[in-house]
Regions:
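General beta-strand structural signal in soluble alpha/beta enzymes
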Residues: 4-6, 51-56, 74-76, 169-174, ...
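ATP-dependent carbohydrate kinase catalytic cores
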Residues: 35, 45, 173-181, 185-188, ...
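Active-site phosphate-binding/coordination module
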Residues: 70-118, 173-177, 449
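Short acidic, glycine/serine/threonine-rich loops at helix termini
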Residues: 17-18, 65-70, 76, 83-90, ...
């Protein structure tokens, strides 16, 4: 029986079918109705007798970016109605005191307070549901003070709202993010409610379309790097905000392990941005929070670091005349000047073409216009453009490696996406990396990651007690720990001597440990994991090529720089520094 993975991107929808060691791929244009693109891609890949169907989508991300979610109300403890608007008083850019904040997902006129208060020792003020006003909304987020510790009041408010508004998507904070830090919990709950009707409608339409096409119900990739049922994804859609990129990291980790590299750095360079993620012992590094479209999301996610540099990034000069690349992008339409679709602004792709790093015709029959690229880059050195964009990506790669205490030379670089293999060798040279792995399916690796993804269900429990008083903990998972009086935590795998593990982690991160100081257990994170299919890729007779050379891949081109040798076996290109 076959296994199908379909990943929807902004421009293309990719499909991979794995059937008894035979791999079939397809790439179709993404339409406004994503479910139509999914079925079209599955058919193009020849999906038949499919036993398992996994899916990555941008529906939730697009709705949040474009602010096209449901009409949402916010209910909190009386006196805290401004919580989503006050935010944290930190600034993303320290020297921009007047920088504008994104608008909250819920306007102040739809933010309501209800009387009742939970304190450290229990109930301080009884809940008064009569103070809950009449609400007219498609979705409601409920976040009462200290509900992560005692959800009695919050549960009662949510039940009352579900009775009053039977067709609304009602989310309570203890159901989605039962952790302390009021603003992040409220922000996550608001996003979960805001996205609910949009994602639920899409997944219902996709499930119906899949059934009509003879496909099983789709499993949906979550930001955590595992798939869940459509019902689970629709219930808490904030969990699928990094769906596609997470699938790419899963694919990179599995492919690196197949090549014998348990430690790797995933490097996904697309048209508008680049995502990087550290993989240690064949597992992607994880984070418990991520900001998306200006909204903090306190949910498990693969620890991606993103920069606005991609193949379609526009080249420009700042007020001082310095060359800059991105974050603006030419997109797919009109695209880079060399696409011949009316684009006139210079891009990274135009520079790569003029440097001889791209063929005259791309996959899909797109003929590149060298003269148009020369006109767009008039007066600009193409090599300087590549140097600038490489510098942007090097910073991202160092963030996930050097800045976290890892020597990148001890890792392989897994390069994928449409533009990743073009820049991989030069980036590896700068970081001292001697092995680069380029998937044969570099342009559709996220879809391949979906094919082999695990089913994963994450849970978190807040403690906020001295570690010595925590009692028995689960045998497996992670613990958020800190010294008493600290504001932030370190996450350490659960083990017998958890205190000693935390001291070591603190010393590695900050250069010192205070073994006489009391340790506080903040939260414990666990995951229920059901392993996905094995990655069984067909091999061909190995061929070897030395750089400089261009190697064509489905949906991508690999630039083999001087001093590098590539071995190709039908599954991947393994590039080695000589």
């Amino acid at each position: 029986m076959a296994v199908l993975g379909v990943d929807v991107g902004g421009t293309f929808t990719d499909a991979v079918v794995l059937d008894g060691g035979r791999v079939t791929t397809a790439k179709v244009l993404t339409s406004a109705r994503q479910e139509e693109s999914v079925i079209a891609a599955a058919r193009a890949a020849g999906a038949e007798n499919v036993e398992r169907f996994a899916h990555g989508t941008t529906v939730a991300t697009n709705a949040l970016l474009e602010r096209k979610g449901a009409r949402t109300a916010f209910v909190t403890t009386v006196g805290f109605e401004h919580l989503l608007h006050l935010r944290r008083q930190t600034r993303a850019h320290l020297y921009r005191p007047c920088a504008a904040w994104p608008e909250p997902l819920v306007p102040l006129e739809r933010s309501h307070g209800v009387r009742g208060r939970i304190g450290p020792a229990g109930e301080l003020e009884p809940l008064d549901l009569d103070t809950l006003p009449q609400i007219d909304a498609e979705a409601v987020a409920v976040c009462l003070l200290h509900a992560y510790r005692d959800a009695t009041h919050e549960r009662a408010v949510a039940e009352e709202l579900r009775l009053r508004l039977p067709h609304a998507h009602v989310v309570a904070s203890h159901e989605v993010a039962p952790e302390f830090r009021e603003y992040e919990r409220a922000s996550t709950t608001a996003a979960d409610a805001y996205l609910g009707p949009v994602v639920s409608g899409y997944l219902h339409a996709l499930s119906a379309a899949a059934a009509s096409a003879g496909l099983p119900a789709p499993l949906v990739m979550r930001s955590s790097g595992g798939v869940a049922t459509p019902a689970e994804a629709a219930e808490h859609p904030a969990t699928i905000l990094v769906s596609g990129p997470a699938a790419g990291v899963v694919g990179a980790a599995r492919l690196a392990a197949l090549a014998g590299n348990e430690n790797a750095i995933a490097f996904d360079m697309g048209g508008t941005s680049t995502d990087v993620c550290l993989i240690a012992d064949s597992h992607a590094e994880r984070a418990s929070e991520r900001t998306i479209a200006g909204v903090p999301i306190r949910l498990p996610t693969v620890d991606l670091h993103t920069v606005g540099a991609g193949g379609g990034s526009i080249v420009w000069r700042d007020a001082g005349g310095a060359l800059r690349v991105g974050p603006q992008s030419a997109g797919a339409d009109p695209g880079p000047a060399c696409y011949g679709r009316g684009g006139t602004q210079p891009t990274v792709t135009d520079a790569n073409l003029l440097l001889g790093r791209l063929p005259d015709t791309l996959a899909g029959g797109v003929e590149l216009d060298r003269a148009a690229a020369e006109r767009a880059l008039a007066g600009i050195d193409p090599a300087a453009v590549v140097d600038v964009v490489n510098a942007e990506m090097l910073r991202a790669l160092r963030v996930v490696s050097v800045q976290r205490g890892h020597d990148p030379a001890a890792f392989a670089l897994v390069a994928y996406g449409g533009a990743g293999p073009l820049h991989a060798c030069e980036l590896a040279d700068e970081l001292g990396i001697t092995t680069v792995i380029v998937p044969e399916a570099a342009g559709v690796l996220s879809a391949l990651g979906l094919v082999v993804s695990d089913e994963r269900r994450d849970a978190v429990r807040s403690y906020l007690v001295p570690l010595a008083e925590a009692g028995e903990l689960p045998p497996a998972g992670e613990a958020d720990l800190r010294y008493e009086g600290q504001s932030f935590e370190l996450t350490v795998p659960l083990q017998d001597d958890l205190a000693e593990a935390f001291h070591r982690a603190h010393a590695e991160q900050y250069g010192f440990a205070e073994r006489e100081r009391e340790i506080e257990l903040v939260a414990v994170r666990t995951a229920d994991i059901r392993p996905g299919p094995d990655l069984d890729l067909p091999r061909t007779e190995q061929t070897t090529v030395a750089g400089p050379s261009l190697l064509a891949l489905p949906g991508a081109t690999c630039w083999l720089a001087p001093g590098w040798v590539g071995a190709r076996d039908g599954r991947m290109l393994r590039l080695t520094k000589q």
